[in-house]
Amino acid sequence: MSLVNNEFSKKQAIFTVSDANYAVMALTMFDSVSEHYPEIDLFLFVVGKGNVDKIDNNINVIYIHDILDDIDLSQRISYYLQVELATSFRPQCFEHLFSHNYDSAIYLDPDLYIFRRMTEVDELLEDGASGVVTPHALKTVRSNVAVIGDETFLKCGIFNLGFLALNCTSETLRMLSWWKDKLKWQCVADSRLGLFVDQKWLDLLPTYFDGFEILKSPLYNLAPWNSEHYSVISDLHGKFYIDNFDNPIAFIHFSGVRRASNHFSFLK
């Protein structure tokens, strides 16, 4: 049975993590998800203070302070910078969903936008993969052309964790336990230590754990750091493609986009 035909036998969730100030961008991402996955439950895990309970009736809001004990949370708040803090909770978010009987869960950054069903991911999960990750780039990126180049990937990680899809398998739970332990005190952005928040740790994923698939497709995670290799075209319906209309983009990662008054600007 294939997930792409809307014949779901499994309970699935898609979620993101955000503070209250960034929740509007998360709402835009969720709107794009709902268009193509109306049957999937949506979750917003909120870091810090700020009430977003009424953001959207279709989005389940969970506050991080409700799923972590007070001592753990207060220690992280005093120890981590804001970005480090927000990324340090991701394993607990997956575990929370799995503990509530979700068979699979997909994390998406708030600055992603979905243009179609993620068919290739759905099929890998249905076939029993422990999880699915996407690389930052599939071809060399020259540092003299782009602000971000190959050297940057060596520092920040092979995989971009703006997207992470996991099945609730014993191997996945083992990975989450390991990852959670690492991120309690080592979710820092410090190139001297060879660390980049939660992301760099998963360079070890293919060798430490079984069943994780690397989705090498330019149709996933198109972003400023890899777009130089591709010709992007659009149709009259607002869909985007790579090279020709046979290659529909699944999602674009609008990393670096910030709202300025009534328009959005791209900040490298």
Feature locations, PLM:
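Glycosyltransferase catalytic domains, chiefly GT-A lineage
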Residues: 1-268
